[in-house]
């Protein structure tokens, strides 16, 4: 429709987003909570446009501290590809109770040797206090996540959105 519609959260897997407009041109915006307007990227009818999302931001997770805010610890020596204000999604395939989607990073702590802690840790605005058990998933990954907003130039139409590998 001619009003902005937004996708659910998408975990970033590649550096490029492909948008195909079917039957009518669309305006596209992306980010943590985007709204599409006539000032955004335009994709013409039956056109195909590739949009650069920037480098993929992802990191292994070695510890999760539960609470009204959630603290995520990364392996020593790796750092954090995330900054305050980024939105992230956690996938813990062996402990899915710890999974969360599209939560905001509220703090990044890069200070070493605070209480014997040497890795980078971040705080996320996710309330994990109701999650039971102790985190111990060696395959857990935190990824930057985003949403895509689309607005047609007139009437109704469809837009197909997918992450692709650009070569």
Show which residues each predicted segment covers.
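Solvent-exposed, flexible loop/coil segments flanking beta-strands in beta-rich domains
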Residues: 1-13, 55-56
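Short proline/glycine-enriched turn/loop motifs at strand-loop junctions of beta-rich domains
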Residues: 12-14, 20-27, 77-83, 153-155
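Small/polar beta-strand repeat architecture
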Residues: 55-167
């Amino acid at each position: 429709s001619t009003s902005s519609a937004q996708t659910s959260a998408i975990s970033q897997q590649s550096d490029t987003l492909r948008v195909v407009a079917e039957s009518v041109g669309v305006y596209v915006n992306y980010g943590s909570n985007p709204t599409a307007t006539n000032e955004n990227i335009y994709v013409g009818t039956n056109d195909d446009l590739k949009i650069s999302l920037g480098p993929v931001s992802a990191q292994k997770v070695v510890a999760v501290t539960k609470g009204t805010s959630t603290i995520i610890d990364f392996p020593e020596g790796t750092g954090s590809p995330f900054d305050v204000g980024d939105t992230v999604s956690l996938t813990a395939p062996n402990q899915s109770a710890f999974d969360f989607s599209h939560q905001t990073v509220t703090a990044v702590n890069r200070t070493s040797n605070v209480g014997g802690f040497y890795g980078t840790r971040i705080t996320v605005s996710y309330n994990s206090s109701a999650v039971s058990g102790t985190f111990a998933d060696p395959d857990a990954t935190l990824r930057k996540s985003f949403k895509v907003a689309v607005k047609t130039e007139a009437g109704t139409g469809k837009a197909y959105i997918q992450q692709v590998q650009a070569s």
